[in-house]
Amino acid sequence: MAKLTKDELIEAFKEMTLIELSEFVKEFEEVFEVTAAAPVAVAAAGAAGGEAAAAEEKDEFDVVLEDAGAKKIGVIKVVRELVSGLGLKEAKELVEGAPKAILEGANKDDAEAAKAKLEEAGAKVTLK
């Protein structure tokens, strides 16, 4: 197998959908027995280090779809609105694969607005 350069890998990733990239990351973590959650652990350790860190307000949120509820079609429509470039099939897979992060690293206002839209559509949502 020919060795791919970093640029070739990046170009291949650009052509993948969000769902495909998510599945790739999960498989990568399993094959190499690593986790992409290290930054979260570092942030948690930093917050435990002092009162100043605890006083800071969190400015980035992940909007996590816990359950689509009974009105799955409405939730799929809202997910397509929130995630740009997401096709119907990808949105459906994302909703059916709950719990899944819909938005990652969103500011507080966007995260709360997305949560409100999803809950209005009948979904159960958490902010992390």
From Swiss-Prot:
GO terms for biological process: translation. This is Large ribosomal subunit protein bL12. One of its GO terms (cellular component) is cytosolic large ribosomal subunit. Keywords: Ribonucleoprotein, Ribosomal protein. It comes from Corynebacterium efficiens (strain DSM 44549 / YS-314 / AJ 12310 / JCM 11189 / NBRC 100395). Gene3D superfamilies: 3.30.1390.10, Single helix bin. Forms part of the ribosomal stalk which helps the ribosome interact with GTP-bound translation factors. Is thus essential for accurate translation. Belongs to the bacterial ribosomal protein bL12 family. HAMAP family: Ribosomal_bL12 (MF_00368). Pfam families: Ribosomal_L12, Ribosomal_L12_N. Homodimer. Part of the ribosomal stalk of the 50S ribosomal subunit. Forms a multimeric L10(L12)X complex, where L10 forms an elongated spine to which 2 to 4 L12 dimers bind in a sequential fashion. Binds GTP-bound translation factors. GO terms for molecular function: mRNA binding; structural constituent of ribosome.
